[in-house]
Amino acid sequence: MPKPPLPADVAALLAKPNPAVMGTIHPDGHPVTVATWYLVEDDGRILLNLDASRARLKHLRAHPQVSLTAIDEANWYTHVSVQGRVVEIRDDTDLVDIDRLSVHYGGNPYPVRDRARVSVLVEIDHWHGWGAAKQD
């Protein structure tokens, strides 16, 4: 699998608010997947944001490996999967990061303001694409 930096066409696909699925590792070792929002930061890391009470935050603290598959909304056959590791977990005290994600995906700030949120930054170790994102 290729390693970063991402080619321009792959970076462009990941920059869109595409549907995505995040994979974590349950404490008993089995994979757990969930739909999620994400943003690619200027430094190439992936920003995720979680409700602080969610089990996947515990999964990430115990096993910092993450996979994320972003599916091109216009053609689900075209997708990019990244595998990486959590390099930072921080409280999203003022809900700045979840608002950024919510605006990216829906155009408005995140409506739920009374629950603690946590931001997770993932550094990409390697990636692969399929469909129009496939690299030979």
Residue spans for each PLM region:
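Non-catalytic surface loops within mature trypsin-like serine protease
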Residues: D42, A52, D72, E88, ...
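Charged, gly/pro-rich active-site loop segments
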Residues: M1-P5, Y77-D136
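Short, surface-exposed beta-strand-loop junctions and turns on beta-sheet-rich folds
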Residues: R54-R56, N75, D136
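Residues at secondary-structure transition points
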Residues: P4-A8, D51, A55, R113
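A short beta-turn/loop motif at secondary-structure boundaries
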Residues: D28-H30, D72-W76, D114
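Extreme N-terminal tail/first-helix region
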Residues: M1-P17
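Short beta-strand segments
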Residues: P17-A52, V66-A70, S81
